[in-house]
């Protein structure tokens, strides 16, 4: 697909593992990415920052990194800043885009200011009175609601709340993961979609139909009964418009090259963006490989394409 001589990449580290709540997912993603790059002839090597200092990348002659870390310091700008310091090119967004992309609260603030539609929401702080805030939030946003930590990925600790009585406990649970909790109005009627972004590839939208209440961690990485619809069933002109809006949602956060933008449609077909992912999962259940496969791009070709974006100025 790319026609790139794999020698151009030099010695490549596949960063995976790490210390976040998404470590196990990252280990799976990283192993597959490593194999995909090696299948294409890339000089790729495993590197787990939880086990080795990042300075070893420079000491051992790595010139490029494929970031398969998920959540925590692998996705919040810290690894990106360190790689910048060591002069190592890497996949995905830089410090700013990574930091904003993992912070759902500040993501939504930017979107509100730049005209990207996002569900109405409230924030709750860890030391707030959960019962009092729950009463206020239900009065303002109604039910059902989604409760999520501001800075976790893979739907870690995301809860759907259908009754006012259940909201205080959901707030308390989410607050164990982050000092800021997002409470978001549930958008009903049109389904959940994702737009995968990989440079100039025109990847199809995917409609996600989980067997359970919503697309949670289990549905993403464990369950085999989640449906991924490609084509997504939308008219071509609407799909093209949503892809453009997804790219805007990605770009206004300072995100670059590679990632995902997730959104809901309401019954009237209006889009509401939930979050971006600047280091998407690359497991057997993950969405970018599915989107690529639908247009004839293999897993190995996809990871080479993503890595090739690090060759750009």
UniProtKB/Swiss-Prot annotation:
Organism in which the protein naturally occurs: Burkholderia multivorans (strain ATCC 17616 / 249)
Gene name per UniProt: ddl
Pathway where this protein functions: Cell wall biogenesis; peptidoglycan biosynthesis
Coiled coil: none
Family named by the database record: Belongs to the D-alanine--D-alanine ligase family.
Reactions catalysed: 2 D-alanine + ATP = D-alanyl-D-alanine + ADP + phosphate + H(+)
Name of the protein: D-alanine--D-alanine ligase
Co-factor binding details: Binds 2 magnesium or manganese ions per subunit.
Domain of life (superkingdom): Bacteria
BP-aspect Gene Ontology terms: cell wall organization; peptidoglycan biosynthetic process; regulation of cell shape
GO cellular component labels: cytosol
EC number: 6.3.2.4
Molecular functions (GO terms): ATP binding; D-alanine-D-alanine ligase activity; metal ion binding
Cofactor entry: Mg(2+); Mn(2+)
Entry keywords, A to Z: ATP-binding, Cell shape, Cell wall biogenesis/degradation, Cytoplasm, Ligase, Magnesium, Manganese, Metal-binding, Nucleotide-binding, Peptidoglycan synthesis
């Amino acid at each position: 697909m790319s026609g790139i001589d794999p020698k151009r990449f030099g010695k490549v580290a596949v960063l995976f593992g790490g210390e976040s709540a998404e470590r196990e997912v990252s280990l799976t993603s990283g192993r597959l990415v490593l194999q995909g790059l090696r299948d294409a002839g890339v000089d790729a090597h495993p590197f787990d920052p939880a086990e080795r200092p990042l300075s070893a990348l420079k000491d051992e002659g790595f010139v490029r990194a494929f970031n398969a870390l998920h959540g925590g310091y692998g996705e919040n700008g810290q690894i990106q800043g360190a790689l910048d310091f060591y002069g190592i090119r890497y996949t995905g967004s830089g410090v700013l885009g990574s930091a904003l992309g993992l912070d759902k609260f500040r993501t939504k603030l930017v979107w509100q200011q730049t005209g990207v539609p996002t569900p109405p929401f409230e924030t709750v702080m860890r030391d707030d009175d959960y019962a009092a805030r729950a009463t206020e939030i239900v009065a303002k946003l109604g039910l059902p609601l989604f409760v999520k930590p501001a800075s976790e990925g893979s739907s870690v600790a995301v809860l759907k709340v259908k009754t006012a009585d259940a909201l205080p406990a959901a707030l308390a649970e989410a607050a164990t993961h982050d000092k800021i909790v997002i409470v978001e109005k549930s958008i009903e009627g049109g389904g959940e979609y994702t737009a995968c972004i990989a440079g100039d590839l025109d990847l199809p939208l995917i409609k996600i139909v989980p067997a359970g209440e919503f697309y949670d961690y289990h549905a993403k990485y464990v369950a085999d009964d989640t449906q991924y619809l490609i084509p997504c069933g939308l008219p071509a002109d609407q799909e093209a418009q949503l892809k453009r809006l997804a790219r805007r949602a990605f770009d206004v956060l300072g995100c670059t090259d590679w990632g995902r933008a997730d959104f809901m449609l309401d019954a009237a077909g209006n889009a509401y963006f939930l979050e971006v992912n600047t280091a998407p999962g690359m497991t057997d259940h993950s969405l970018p490989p599915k989107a690529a496969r639908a247009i004839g791009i293999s897993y190995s070709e996809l990871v080479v394409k993503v890595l090739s974006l690090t060759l750009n100025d």
